[in-house]
Design a protein with these regions (language model features):
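Acidic, His/Gly-rich catalytic cores of divalent-metal-dependent hydrolytic chemistry
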Residues: 261-286
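Phosphate-coordination/substrate-recognition cap region in phosphate-metabolizing enzymes
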Residues: 2-23, 27-28, 67-150
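Active-site-adjacent alpha-helix immediately C-terminal to a catalytic or transition-state-stabilizing loop
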Residues: 100, 177-257
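Short, conserved phosphate/pyrophosphate- and ester-handling motifs at nucleotide-, phospho-/glycolipid
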Residues: 38, 61, 219
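Short, P/G- and charge-enriched loop/turn segments at secondary-structure junctions
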Residues: 19-24, 204, 235-239, 276-278, ...
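Loop-to-helix element that buttresses phosphate recognition and phosphoryl-transfer chemistry
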Residues: 42-106, 161-178
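Short hydrophobic segments within beta-strands
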Residues: 36, 92-94, 217
Length: 286
């Protein structure tokens, strides 16, 4: 294994660090990935684990997503979002009903704002983590039937998972496959980026130009894995990230390096940050 000093020598020679695995992000890619979690659902209101069970958006959930769509259609309105003014080249979404409907509402919001409407594409790799025998149950019911397995999942998610469900390693494999495809598409025809520029916000970037970007509509659990994959973090960081209902999160790719620009940008009720968190952090939200 190379030492950091050896990797630094390779970097000075214009060579990438010698690591065992091929990098997920294409070298030199400049792009933006925007994550939008689905809106409130019936199961979230009831405090039930969703996993891959179908559960519809509530009327409030549809309103949440429609507001997020208008925000994305006017990204540079005050306060601005750190995303390009151009439309995304694709809206890739989990094929589950709650995310499919959320993606449709985002497209409707783009159209209502007179913006170009990006194509929709279902991506099975963005499905929520399968929670097996826990799906449809409340945490109280899970604890009564399965003892401390839920507590173990919340403490060591990289080591434990629901009976009949998916391990995070299994989820990571499908997430990486989906991201590899999307990142390759983003790199198609994109201008190669460079790290030879300011990496601290606030400085003018005179080389900046509109970047290609992709909009992903998914779930809180799978998005945690997406962020770990893009940042090169191990899965024991799973619970370090959280995603609000219908909130917008932005990851910028700078010359092949993922940088979090913001998590949980949220227009909220009538353009304000929501103060009523009913359903946002319900234990059945995963």
């Amino acid at each position: 294994m190379n030492t950091p000093l050896q990797d630094a020598e390779r970097s000075r020679a214009g060579e990438p660090p010698a690591s065992g695995a091929a990098p997920l992000i294409p070298d030199g890619l400049d792009a933006v990935i925007v994550l939008v979690r689905h809106g409130q659902t019936e199961f979230i209101v009831q405090g039930r684990f969703q996993g891959q069970m179908e559960t519809p958006l509530t009327p409030r959930g549809e309103r949440q997503i429609s507001r997020a769509g208008l925000r994305l259609a006017h990204p540079h309105d005050d306060p601005p979002l750190p995303i390009p003014e151009t439309a995304p080249f694709i809206i890739a979404h989990s094929p589950l009903e709650r995310t499919r409907r959320s993606a449709e509402l985002l497209v409707e919001a783009f159209a209502a704002a007179g913006r170009a409407t990006p194509p929709l594409r279902p991506e099975p790799g963005l499905k929520e983590i399968a929670q097996g025998d826990w799906e449809g149950l409340t945490d109280t019911e899970i604890s009564a039937r399965f003892g401390d397995s839920l507590g173990a999942w919340r403490r060591w998610p990289e080591l434990t998972y629901a009976p009949g469900g998916e391990s995070l390693e299994e989820v990571l494999r499908r997430v990486e496959s989906t991201l590899t495809k999307l990142l390759t598409e983003l790199a198609d025809g994109a201008r190669p980026g460079t790290m030879d520029r300011h990496q601290v916000l606030g400085y003018a970037d005179h080389s900046a130009e509109p970047k290609r970007w992709a909009l992903l509509v998914g779930h809180g659990g799978v998005f945690r894995v997406v962020v770990c994959a893009l940042l090169g973090l191990s899965l024991d960081h799973f619970w370090n990230f959280d995603f609000g209902l219908a909130a917008v999160s932005v990851i910028e790719i700078r010359a092949g390096r993922a940088v979090i620009r913001g998590l949980n940008f949220d227009a909220g009720e009538e353009g304000r940050i929501e103060t009523d968190d009913t359903g946002r952090d319900a234990k059945g939200a995963l």
